[in-house]
UniProtKB/Swiss-Prot annotation:
It comes from Mus musculus. Residues 480-490 have a biased composition (Basic residues). Mediates nucleation of actin filaments and thereby promotes actin polymerization. Plays a role in the regulation of actin filament length. Required for normal sarcomere organization in the heart, and for normal heart function. It holds the Pfam family Tropomodulin. Residues 524-543 form the WH2 domain. Disruption phenotype: Mutant mice are born at the expected Mendelian rate. All die between 15 to 33 days after birth due to early-onset dilated cardiomyopathy. Cardiac muscle thin filaments are shorter than in wild-type, both in embryonic heart and in pups 6 or 15 days after birth. Hearts appear grossly normal at birth, but after 15 days, they display enlarged left ventricles with thin ventricle walls and resuced systolic performance. In contrast, there are no differences in thin filament length in skeletal muscle. InterPro entries: LRR_dom_sf (IPR032675), TMOD (IPR004934). Residues 84-202, 359-527 are annotated as: Disordered. Its main location: cytoplasm. The gene is Lmod2. Residues 1-165 are annotated as: Interaction with actin 1. This is Leiomodin-2. Residues 151-164, 170-193, 391-402, 468-479 have a biased composition (Polar residues).
């Protein structure tokens, strides 16, 4: 009866025209209907993350571009794939393989037990997990296809229909687009290869740098291969071979490049021949003591290298290698900077003294060159001065101007026959007056007063005063006769004591005061007890007892 009533209720909706009903709906009602239909039956061709529409009515505050996000994810995934291909993630892959092998061994050993314990419920749960994994794989494939759509810019999600034949046509469209876009997948990989080859950020292109070194390019004064981890030992050896004949490169850096002893030996052979490189950096590599000692032996034939860095190697050098390094570098006089921390104090101090000696020699050489240059310049200056003395120099003052008026003419004196009259002769001096009589002479002047005795000023030369006092004491001691068994007390002068006391420093006075034993201070009780011990009964006298004590 219930089903019959339900069908009777549905029969009244069969006569309704759907087109008229949809035409009568407003735009808002149509949007709401679309939302309801999407929730009831979502589009299976869309990935799971895009099936649910945004329910927020607010406008977005930031700029969000889904196409840019998908393109970024695509680039990152390609970079990861490229790293795996180049061996960046080799260690992680090996660890995963080891873990998987252990799991396989564990499952094989316990397979018999697991088969017995396994029940029907567990089998059903395993089947459900497999189904869910298959669904996730299909969803991931759909996401990748959506990413390719947005990158190529030819397919949109609005054009996706619910037909079953659509996936096949979609795949064919993608293949045609990739083939007819003008740039195939190979060119796309090549365009992204520089970023994938050097994920560390080093912009050096290995082949171009090697070609420039071989051609002796004048602009290439530094070769920087730092942090390029996918470079091989053969490539580093090729760089060392190319640098043997190069005369321009001054700095060669290959830190953190996984270089080993073979690369170090190639660098040592290069340093024996090259006389232009001044700095080598091989820090953070896999070089052992053998490779480092090979480089140190090469420095015995190299007189140009001033800086060498080989710290932070994978293997520890050890005390024997450090001692050998110091022994080999004793005869080197050009190395100024060594980038390595010695573990032993002995080699460390020896290496410090060697580097200090080399820096001092370089300074002396530089000073000598400056003196020679100044000497050449001084000799040339002396020659120019002597040459300038022989030539008349120009006056610093300007020449006087000519007067606008003509100078007066001086008439010449004509000597005639007439002689001039003689000049008058001076009269003779008068005779001296006669001497006066004795009673008319003036009294003689009084005799001059005797000169006052000069007061001897006190000199402040303390040393002279001390010498005088000591000489006086010696004279007194020599003049007096010493008596046997008697000591003569020396009573120095007060002035000498004051002078000696003034010459002593404050510290000496404090030391003298502290060296003297301090005088003991007795209390009243001690004085009383000492008096009682020293007294006797005869010395005591009778004393009346006071009334308060009676």
């Amino acid at each position: 009866m219930s089903t019959f009533g339900y069908r009777r209720g549905l029969s009244k909706y069969e006569s309704i025209d759907e087109d008229e009903l949809l035409a009568s709906l407003s735009p808002e009602e149509l949007k709401e209907l679309e939302r309801e239909l999407e929730d009831i039956e979502p589009d299976r061709n869309l990935p799971v993350g895009l099936r649910q529409k945004s329910l927020t009515e607010k406008t977005p505050t930031g700029n969000f571009s889904r196409e840019a996000l998908m393109a970024y994810w695509e680039k990152e995934s390609q970079k990861l794939l490229e790293k795996e291909r180049l061996g960046e993630c080799g260690k992680v892959a090996e660890e995963d393989k080891e873990e998987s092998e252990e799991e396989l061994i564990f499952t094989e050993s316990n397979s018999e037990v697991s088969e017995e314990v396994c029940t029907e419920d567990e089998e059903e749960s395993q089947e459900e997990e497999e189904d869910s994994e298959e669904e996730e794989d299909s969803e991931e494939e759909e996401e990748t296809t959506e990413a390719t759509k947005h990158i190529n810019g030819t397919v949109s999600y609005n054009s996706v229909n619910t037909d079953n034949s659509k996936p096949k046509t979609f795949k064919s469209q993608i293949e045609n687009i990739n083939l007819t876009n003008g740039n195939s997948g190979r060119t796309q990989r090549n365009s992204e290869s520089p970023a994938a080859i050097h994920p560390c950020g080093n912009p050096t292109v290995i082949e171009d740098a090697l070609e420039k070194i071989r051609n002796n390019d004048p602009d290439t004064t530094e070769v920087n291969l730092n942090n390029i981890e996918n470079i091989t030992t053969q490539t580093l050896s090729r760089f060392a071979e190319a640098l043997k004949e190069n005369t321009v490169v001054k700095t060669f850096s290959l830190a953190n490049t996984h270089a080993d002893d073979a690369a170090a030996i190639a660098i040592a052979d290069m340093l024996k021949v090259n006389e232009h490189i001044t700095s080598v950096n091989v820090e953070s590599n896999f070089i052992t003591g053998k490779g480092i000692l090979a480089i140190m032996r090469a420095l015995q034939h190299n007189t140009v290298l001033t800086e060498l860095r080989f710290h932070n190697q994978r293997h520890i050098m050890g005390s024997q290698v450090e001692m050998e390094i110091v022994k080999l570098l004793k005869e080197n006089t050009t190395l100024l900077r060594l980038g390595y921390h010695f573990e032993l104090p002995g080699p460390r101090m020896s290496m410090t003294s060697i580097l200090t000696r080399n820096m001092d020699k370089q300074r002396q050489k530089r000073m000598q060159e400056q003196k020679q240059q100044e000497g050449h310049d001084g000799g040339a200056a002396l020659r120019t001065k002597v040459w300038q003395r022989g030539t008349p120099g120009s006056s610093p003052y300007a020449s006087p101007r000519q007067s606008p008026w003509s100078s007066p003419k001086v008439s010449k004196k004509v000597h005639t026959g007439r002689s001039r009259p003689p000049s008058p002769v001076a009269p003779p001096p008068p005779p001296p007056p006669p001497p006066l009589p004795p009673h008319m002479l003036p009294p003689p002047p009084p005799p001059p007063a005797p000169p006052l005795p000069e007061k001897k000023l006190i000199t402040r030369n303390i040393a002279e005063v001390i010498k005088q006092q000591e000489s006086a004491q010696r004279a007194l001691q020599n003049g007096q006769r010493k008596k046997k068994g008697k000591k003569v007390k020396k009573q120095p002068n007060n002035i000498l004591k004051e002078i000696k006391n003034s010459l002593r420093s404050v510290q000496e006075k404090k030391m003298e005061d502290s060296s003297r034993p301090s005088t003991p201070q007795r209390s009243v009780h001690e004085n009383l007890m000492e008096a009682i011990r020293g007294s006797s009964i005869r010395q005591l006298r009778r004393v009346e007892v006071p009334e308060a004590l009676r």
